[in-house]
């Protein structure tokens, strides 16, 4: 965290894959410090999501509730699996946006149906278009496949420009 103010640092990465849990009281002081540092330096906090255990959206979603009023929170992998995708695209992602939370996401590792469904939900609800960005999770991801699915889902118009360029620029430039 002491390097957070160095030139070129744009984000802090947070994962619970190796231990800890957002709702563990012993973790809360550390989380407070991480998010306070991010706020002080205007950094995004990347939060890794995956199905089940401590990285499940039901756990890491608390970070959005607690901190995304003042810090941009990037939920990597849009919930990390089918259950997370359904919970987020079904309403939670949009509920957070409506509540004023600074929540962003990418669709790396997204299950095949999600990009199209999410694009339709964004269109239907009229919000969220500026909260989704392209990411490929290289070297583990499928760049060509993820790019193609997202390009097809966004249709190459304004939503595509935001997803592939403008939202990233807003967060990280």
Regions found by a protein language model. Give the residues of each.
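Conserved, mostly hydrophobic/aromatic
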Residues: 3-4, 12, 38, 105, ...
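Conserved residues at the C-terminal ends of beta-strands
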Residues: 15
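Ankyrin-repeat helical core positions
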Residues: 4-5, 65
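Short, acidic/polar
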Residues: 1-4, 90
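Mid-to-C-terminal alpha-helical segments outside catalytic/metal-binding sites
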Residues: 127-133, 141-173
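Catalytic pocket-lining loop regions of alpha/beta-barrel enzymes
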Residues: 10-11, 24-133
């Amino acid at each position: 965290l002491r390097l957070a103010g160095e030139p070129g640092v744009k984000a802090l990465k947070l994962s619970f894959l190796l231990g800890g849990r957002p709702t563990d009281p012993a973790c809360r002081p550390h989380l407070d410090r991480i998010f306070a540092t991010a706020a002080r330096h205007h950094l995004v906090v990347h939060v890794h999501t995956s199905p089940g255990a401590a990285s499940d959206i039901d756990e890491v979603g608390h970070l959005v509730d607690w901190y995304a009023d003042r810090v941009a929170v990037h939920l990597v992998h849009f919930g990390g699996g089918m259950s997370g995708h359904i919970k987020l695209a079904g309403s939670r992602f949009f509920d957070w946006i409506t509540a004023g939370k600074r929540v962003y996401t990418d669709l790396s590792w997204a299950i095949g149906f999600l990009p199209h469904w999410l694009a339709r939900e964004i269109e239907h609800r009229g919000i969220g278009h500026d909260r989704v960005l392209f990411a490929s999770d290289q070297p583990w991801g499928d760049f060509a496949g993820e790019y193609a699915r997202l390009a097809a889902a966004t249709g190459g118009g304004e939503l595509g420009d935001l997803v592939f360029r403008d939202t990233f620029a807003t967060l990280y430039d």
